[in-house]
Structure formats: structure tokens, C-alpha cells
């Protein structure tokens, strides 16, 4: 089951999947065509439950095993999978990223195609468990600020040092993934294809993505991640944020070079707060 959430992903995603052999694709009709008003999904973000609900309804009617949804500009992809009781569970970007990282690395090792000095790039708000998976396969982790442009920047730096071929995978917790160095930004088409390949591989062994995720937790440690967004709308919201930032800056003893704060509560539990202007 696939939804473009009334965005641009329909043609590139479905064409790519069909050309790669995934032809049994059902599309969510109400969200098929681009529509900037987003009539069925006021907040077309594949990270959130509300955006995926119509797709889940379709998936349940069609008995689909996997639901894919790309955001309007098709650079991010979210998924929901069927659990043991037939209900659909939305995976977080962190969970999907962990699964993809392990799958890509394990397949490279299995087929003798692991790169020299392999590298995984992630944002600092992305789950730390990914570093343990990367280390298991011999990958070096590069942590960067939030924003996939910084992952692209690292690919550029690797390229300048003649090490672009060492890039294996990059992702951020907001459902952005990139499996190669051919572009400098997250790619929903690439992500959708790799998710389908991974899903098919495990399905052939009668292993669900939820089962595989549980297996990873048992090996590398159980993790919990949640995302909370707080909106400050309009000019009043902007003014409130500006006053708050100025007030905090006046009381701060040291300069803050990044638009985020990371709090270590009880190690390894941490929380990150960051601002984002839309």
C-alpha cells in the first residue's frame, strides 16, 4: 500500500518499485494526486499517526503487509507494518533507520561488498543505538547537526578526501534516509525501494520487521524514543520565541553555538530541544 499524501511521490515511487519487480502496489486514491490544500491530511507528515490513518484503513481492507507514505516533496518516507494481531503499527524514523542500517550492512558483509573505512552519518538527535550497530559492522560514525544538508556536506568532505566511496548510509530521526553518495539530500524514492527490498528479504524468511526490530533490541539494548512538537503560530508566536530566546541568552553564562540543547537526564537517557523556523 502506498500514499503520496497528495504530494509529488506517486510517479517516481511507483515507477521505481515496479521496475525493480514490486508490482503489487495499491495506491490510496484520495491522496493520489498532488493537491497543495491537502484535503485528507492537514499535516502531511509521514512521521505522525494522523497522516497515516487513511492509508492504514486502506491497508486493512486490502490486507496489505506494508504501508509506505512519502511526504509532499518525496524526500522522506514513513512506514506502518502489520503486527501479530493484524493491526498496523507506525514505525518511527529511528526504528526504520536502525532496520535499514542493519540490513544494508549485513548484506554488504554477506556478499563481500563492505567498503574500505566504511562510514555512517547521522544527526545528533538520532538514536545512539545506531552507533552500536554501525560499530558491530566496522563502520565509523559521524555525528552532525540536525538537517540532512549536513549529511550531504559530510559526503562532500569525504569526496574531497577521495573517500566518498566509504559512505554506506545516512539517516535522521525524521524519516530521512540516503543509501548512496549520488545525491546530497535525503531521498524518499531511494528509501521506499530499500524498505521494500528489506521487507521482502525478511518476509521470505517469515520474519516481520517488528520481529527483526525486537531482535536488534535484544542484541544492542532496548531503546525508547518519542517526539514532541510545540508550535508558535503567526507573528505573536514568532515574537514569543524571540523574547524567550533573548531572555535566556541574557541569563546564559556561555555562548550557545547551536540552536539546540541536549540534556543528559540519567545516562544513557537524553533529551534534545531545538528550534526550527518554518
Q: Residue ranges of each PLM-predicted region?
A:
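Gly/Ser/Thr-rich active-site loops/lids in small-molecule metabolic enzymes
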Residues: 23-27, 87-106, 191-194
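Short helix-loop-beta junction
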Residues: 15-27, 131-137
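Well-ordered alpha-helical segments embedded in enzymatic catalytic cores
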Residues: 50-54, 100, 150
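N-terminal small/polar loop signature for handling phosphorylated ligands or for N-terminal nucleophile
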Residues: 21-78
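Active-site pocket-lining segments that scaffold enzyme catalytic pockets across diverse folds
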Residues: 1-22, 31
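Short Gly/Thr/Asp-enriched flexible loops that form oxyanion-binding sites at enzyme active sites
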Residues: 13, 75-94, 130
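Gly/Ser/Thr-rich loops at beta-strand to alpha-helix junctions
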Residues: 4-10, 74-76, 125-128, 235
Amino acid at each position: 500500500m502506498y500514499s503520496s499524501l497528495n504530494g509529488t511521490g506517486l510517479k517516481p515511487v511507483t515507477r521505481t518499485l515496479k521496475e525493480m519487480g514490486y508490482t503489487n502496489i495499491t495506491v490510496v486514491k484520495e491522496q493520489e494526486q498532488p493537491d497543495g490544500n491537502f484535503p485528507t491530511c492537514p499535516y502531511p507528515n509521514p512521521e505522525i499517526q494522523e497522516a497515516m490513518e487513511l492509508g492504514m484503513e486502506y491497508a486493512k481492507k486490502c490486507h496489505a503487509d506494508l504501508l509506505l507514505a512519502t511526504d509532499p516533496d518525496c524526500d522522506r518516507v514513513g512506514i506502518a507494518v502489520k503486527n501479530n494481531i493484524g493491526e498496523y503499527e507506525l514505525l518511527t524514523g529511528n526504528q526504520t533507520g536502525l532496520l535499514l542500517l542493519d540490513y544494508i550492512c549485513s548484506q554488504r558483509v554477506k556478499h563481500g561488498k563492505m567498503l574500505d573505512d566504511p562510514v555512517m552519518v547521522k544527526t545528533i538527535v538520532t538514536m545512539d543505538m545506531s552507533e552500536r550497530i554501525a560499530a558491530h559492522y566496522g563502520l565509523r560514525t559521524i555525528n552532525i547537526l540536525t538537517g540532512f544538508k549536513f549529511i550531504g556536506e559530510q559526503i562532500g568532505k569525504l569526496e574531497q578526501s577521495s573517500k566518498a566511496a566509504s559512505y554506506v548510509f545516512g539517516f535522521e530521526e525524521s524519516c530521512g534516509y540516503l543509501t548512496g553518495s549520488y545525491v546530497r539530500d535525503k531521498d524518499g524514492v531511494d528509501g521506499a525501494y530499500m524498505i521494500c527490498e528489506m521487507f521482502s528479504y525478511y518476509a521470505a524468511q517469515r520474519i516481520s520487521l517488528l520481529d527483526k526490530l525486537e531482535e536488534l533490541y535484544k542484541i544492542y539494548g532496548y531503546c525508547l524514543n518519542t517526539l514532541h512538537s510545540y508550535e508558535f503560530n503567526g507573528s505573536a508566536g514568532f515574537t514569543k520565541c524571540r523574547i524567550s530566546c533573548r531572555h535566556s541568552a541574557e541569563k546564559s553564562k556561555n555562548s550557545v553555538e547551536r540552536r539546540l540543547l541536549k540534556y543528559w537526564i540519567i545516562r544513557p537517557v537524553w533529551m534534545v530541544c531545538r528550534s526550527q523556523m518554518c
